[in-house]
Design a protein with these regions (language model features):
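Short small-residue beta-strand/loop micro-motif enriched in glycine and branched aliphatics
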Residues: 56-61, 113, 138-140
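Short, structured coil segments at secondary-structure junctions
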Residues: 106-107
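Mobile genetic element proteins and their domesticated derivatives, centered on retroelements
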Residues: 36, 50, 56, 75, ...
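Mobile-element integrase/transposase regions
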Residues: 1-47
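C-terminal domain-tail junction helix/linker
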Residues: 138-189
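RNase H-like two-metal-ion nuclease catalytic core shared by retroviral integrases
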Residues: 91-94, 98-101, 113-134, 143-155
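Active-site beta-loop-alpha junctions of metal-dependent nucleic acid enzymes
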Residues: 39-43, 60-83
Length: 189
């Protein structure tokens, strides 16, 4: 602030959201994901949140520290079961996403970064983070969260009907798309 030195640094080899294919914005394709972190009290522990843009399906993982290594490990772990359905990933410019190249290579996906201070460019994920806060409020220490708590939150969020999905649940839409995608892949091989 006020001409001081920038302490956050930059993440090397970032690809701007401006270069992301237009099909992602139109929500026409299954397999475009947004990711972020939700910070617990004390700013140490975090939840990695990932959601598929078309279905609004959410994945959540707890990380003991918000490091690039921990976040990339969590993202890879969450998305590996769906690796054939991961085309793009979009995040903010947080340093926790510094290992974006490792994530992209492991999942065979393209990785994009939104503009700084432009949370609306990842609106679905920011909305999801607000819903996640219903289960894990800002003042909550995340070292008290169990995997069972996370699974319960994911289940509730993914089974909540959404107006934008024609009052279907994210789980219903995700499973339909996943099944359709797997059948398409099977027919191509």
């Amino acid at each position: 602030r006020y001409g001081g030195r920038e302490r956050r640094g930059t993440i090397p080899n970032q690809v701007s959201i401006e270069q992301r294919p237009a099909v992602v914005d139109r929500l026409e394709r299954f397999g475009d994901w947004e990711a972020d972190t939700v910070i617990g009290a004390g700013h140490q522990q975090a939840l990695v949140t990932i959601n598929e843009r078309q279905s609004r399906y959410s994945l959540i993982a707890h990380v003991p520290r918000k490091t690039a290594q921990a976040v990339s490990d969590a993202m890879i772990s969450l998305l590996t079961p769906f690796a054939n359905c991961v085309h793009t990933l979009t995040t903010d410019n947080g340093k926790e996403f510094a290992q974006h190249e490792r994530i992209a290579e492991t999942l065979n996906a393209d990785f994009y970064f939104a503009h700084p201070y432009a949370s609306w460019e990842r609106g679905a994920n920011e909305n999801m983070n607000g819903l996640i806060r219903q289960f894990f409020p800002k003042k909550m220490r995340f070292d008290t969260i169990s995997q069972q708590d996370i699974n319960f939150a994911m289940h509730c969020l993914n089974h909540r009907p959404r107006k934008c999905l024609g009052f279907k649940t994210p789980h219903e839409v995700f499973m339909q798309q996943l099944h359709s995608h797997q059948n398409t892949v099977a027919l191509q091989t």
